[in-house]
């Protein structure tokens, strides 16, 4: 019975393929190969290197799931937003598969995929607020009961996750910075460094992490010897202030929208300090908090496959001749 959808994710530095049953939502296959170690020596993702590693990793993963090919009914792939050369790796493979197996091709927006990480094994819920925090994006969304997405707030410059990477780089801590900063912050003892919360007195529903990042840079310059103890104090102060900033604007949004349900997605949503703060906020406003599983917060093909199930039902297919690659976020107005 042809009821399986194969999905490919390659928007940045994770090569991933997943296969899902469109009827039961059962995951039949999921594999991800991360490039973090390859990029860590450069302090960030190098697009050309990412593309080459995708071209090596994706075929290796594909060989492991060939037994399911006979039951495939569609091929899905992340087509936006992301690094052009990385996206192209996945799209090229998806088009080749769709052509060879004579199957429909489904393009999936990467950010929609993150939203679907909340609903990997269940029907999607509408009428809820969503915080999306990742290395490339920081936004608060309202998923309306008609499936339309309304953008309530976004960042004016750096994203939440990106700011962690940059602060880690300032202190020569390595890449990716999120987990490194989070773990280092736990070692802070004095907690005598503090930073101002960005846009604290602004009524604008927006985020900005560039000023906080600069404040960290200036704090680092104060210390001739940046000891492990001082690094921990800076990491703690930065993480706490970055989360304060997220919560400050969210509180204003909660007062306006009275959410009954609120979801949190994206790679940076794995930060446990942020999760704890969000739980407290939702308890305060009697909202049900829904968190993506830690395993599926970062980029993965299973969330793309899950999004593709609903897209398949709506017959959102494209021709393999169509140019579907877009580094920017184009198709993100509704689920």
From Swiss-Prot:
- Tell where it localizes: Cytoplasm
> What transmembrane ranges does the database entry give?
none
Q: How is the cofactor bound, as the UniProt entry phrases it?
A: Binds 1 Fe(2+) ion per subunit.
Gene this protein is translated from? tsaD
* Family, similarity comment: Belongs to the KAE1 / TsaD family.
Q: What's in the GO CC field? A: cytoplasm
Residues that coordinate or bind substrate: 132-136, 165, 178, 271
Function field: Required for the formation of a threonylcarbamoyl group on adenosine at position 37 (t(6)A37) in tRNAs that read codons beginning with adenine. Is involved in the transfer of the threonylcarbamoyl moiety of threonylcarbamoyl-AMP (TC-AMP) to the N6 group of A37, together with TsaE and TsaB. TsaD likely plays a direct catalytic role in this reaction.
User: What are the leading ranks of the lineage?
Assistant: Bacteria, Pseudomonadati, Campylobacterota, Epsilonproteobacteria, Campylobacterales
Q: What is this protein called?
A: tRNA N6-adenosine threonylcarbamoyltransferase
């Amino acid at each position: 019975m042809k009821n399986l959808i194969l999905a490919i994710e390659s928007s940045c530095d994770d090569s991933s393929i997943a296969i899902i049953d469109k009827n039961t939502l059962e995951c039949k296959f999921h594999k991800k190969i991360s490039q973090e170690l390859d990029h860590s020596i450069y302090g960030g993702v190098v697009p050309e290197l990412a593309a080459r590693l995708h071209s090596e990793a994706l075929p290796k993963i594909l060989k492991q799931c060939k037994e399911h090919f006979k039951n495939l009914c569609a091929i899905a792939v992340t087509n936006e937003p992301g690094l052009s050369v990385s996206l192209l790796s996945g799209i090229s493979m998806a088009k080749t598969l769709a052509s060879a197996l004579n199957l429909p091709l489904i393009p999936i927006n990467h950010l929609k995929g993150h939203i679907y990480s909340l609903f990997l094994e269940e029907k999607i819920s509408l009428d809820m607020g969503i915080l999306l925090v990742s290395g490339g994006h920081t936004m608060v969304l309202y998923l309306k009961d008609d499936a339309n997405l309304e953008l309530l707030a976004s960042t004016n410059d750096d994203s939440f996750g990106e700011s962690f990477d940059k602060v880690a780089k300032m202190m020569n801590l390595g890449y990716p910075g999120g987990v490194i900063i989070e773990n280092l912050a736990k070692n802070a003892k004095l907690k005598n460094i503090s930073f101002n919360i960005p846009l604290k007195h602004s009524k604008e529903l927006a985020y900005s992490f560039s000023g906080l990042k600069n404040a960290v840079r200036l704090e680092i310059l104060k210390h001739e010897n940046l000891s492990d103890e001082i690094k921990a104090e800076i990491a703690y102060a930065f993480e706490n202030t970055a989360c304060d900033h997220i919560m400050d604007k969210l509180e204003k949004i909660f007062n306006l929208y009275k959410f009954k349900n609120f979801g949190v997605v994206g790679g940076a949503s794995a930060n446990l300090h942020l999760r704890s703060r969000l739980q407290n906020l939702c308890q305060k406003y009697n909202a049900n908090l829904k968190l993506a599983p830690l395993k599926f917060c970062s980029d993965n093909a299973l969330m793309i496959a899950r999004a593709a199930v609903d897209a398949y039902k709506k017959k959102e297919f494209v021709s393999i001749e169509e140019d579907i690659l877009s580094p920017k976020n184009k198709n993100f107005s509704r689920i």
